[in-house]
Amino acid sequence: MSDQIIVSTRAFPASGTQDLGFVYGTSCFSANFFKDTFSAIRNTTIGGELGNYTKLMDEGIKSAKERMIENAKALGADGVYAVSIATPQVASGAAEIIMYGTAFKYVN
């Protein structure tokens, strides 16, 4: 899976593929206490984008995607389709990301 095919469509359009099953990647990052406190104050007084949280989410999504791809590679996959992202909250001040989909490979 060196050329990663990652798509969000529910049905992969190409014929000649075989589903390999469900794959996922998870990530959980904690915010820095001081940055978290500053972001909370800024959110209630100034407004605007909370760059610390945006960066946290970006890092979490990237990490979850990499782990999902690793799990797909372990199955011998050429890609993953029906990719979705969930962001459950398991801890305050943390970014939790689950990225999941269906691994597939091309068959001759």
Predicted regions and their residues:
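Short alpha-helical interface elements
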Residues: G47-G48, K62, E66, E70, ...
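Short, well-ordered alpha-helical segments
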Residues: V23, D36-S84
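N-terminal presequence-like segments and the immediate start of the first folded domain
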Residues: M1-K35, A74-D78, A95-N108
